[in-house]
Amino acid sequence: MRLYITGGTGLVGSNIIRLARRRNDIEIIASQYGPAPEWQVDYQLDPLDMADADAVRASIRRYQPDAVIHCAAMLDHVYMQHHRAEAWRATVDANLAFAQSCAEVGARYIFVSSDWVFDGQEPLVSEESPPNPVNFYGFMKAVCERDIMGLPGLSYGIGRMAGIYGLNYAIPHLLMKDNHLGFPITNYIIDRLSQGLIAEIWTGPKVNDMAHASLASDGAELLLRLVEHDENGIFHCWGSEPANRLELAHKIADVFEFDHSLIVPTPTDPIVLDEFRHVRIPFRMVANSELSYKALGRRSYNLVDGLRAFKAELAAQL
């Protein structure tokens, strides 16, 4: 199988490449934009600007992949808010170019989406719940999903992820370890507690207080399963257990044997609140993902199992 991956130097993409390398039946092509990978590159690299839809189409036609996993995404919400046309080209237009090109060459298309297609106000959502995004990022992801589902002749899977943590194997120093209004705070908490430093857990206002934290390697394995799955649809590839921010922090302390007293709930940083004053944040994300588990043949990690697996991955790097 010839597998084309975007975002291969990111958290999810590097984990997909790492898993695909272990298989003898996968030839890897990875698009590149920005810093070059720091690990040994034993696969094809294709320089590509996602904002150039014609370049996207030309790349897929050139490589004729059997499957494409589109992980690349803009993640700076403040920047996107102020540069909407640029973000739209790199997200919505790029997605449509990938999807149309995959339909043209007969490739299966896997698009990595987000729990932020929802507003965070419903008590429970599923793969079948209608999206209701509250910020520009979530709106673009929802538009991408709709464009994919409306394209005739396309074999596709939409894999939603949330609160991603783990190792960036391609460019380790790019790993985000900052506090966040969203739910990707696991790496931040581990980094602080491992140094014996206080980990401030923002409790509001304006935080994603509850979500399904997702280990990148676990999500990557589910996305690879989605490549080989023959059903079209939306699939939840995030962690199987929801938790709020403080519950997550204390589970981390339990698994890694850190000092719980260093976990300090605190109001959201007013400077960050001002920066995000025009960006709404989904508050509470809880999902039923049984349809995805049945289709893909297994459940994703629960919170403790995911953290234990991450602890083992960190130990293997020493």
Question: What feature does the model see in each segment?
Answer:
Residues T6, I201-M210, F235-P242, A295:
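Glycine-rich Rossmann NAD(P)(H)-binding loop
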Residues N132-A162:
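Active-site Tyr-X1-5-Lys
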Residues M1-R23:
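N-terminal Rossmann NAD(P)H-binding glycine-rich loop of SDR-like oxidoreductase domains
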Residues L222-R277, A315-L318:
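Mid/C-terminal beta-alpha module of Rossmann-like enzyme folds, strongest
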Residues A216, N244-H250, T268-D305, Q317-L318:
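Conserved C-terminal active-site "lid" loop/helix of NAD(P)H-dependent oxidoreductases
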Residues P47-T91, S101:
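NAD(P)H-binding glycine-rich loop region in Rossmannoid oxidoreductase-like domains
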Residues G150-A211, S217-D218:
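NAD(P)-dependent short-chain dehydrogenase/reductase
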Residues L96-N132:
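Conserved Rossmann-fold NAD(P)-dependent oxidoreductase catalytic core, especially the SDR/UDP-sugar
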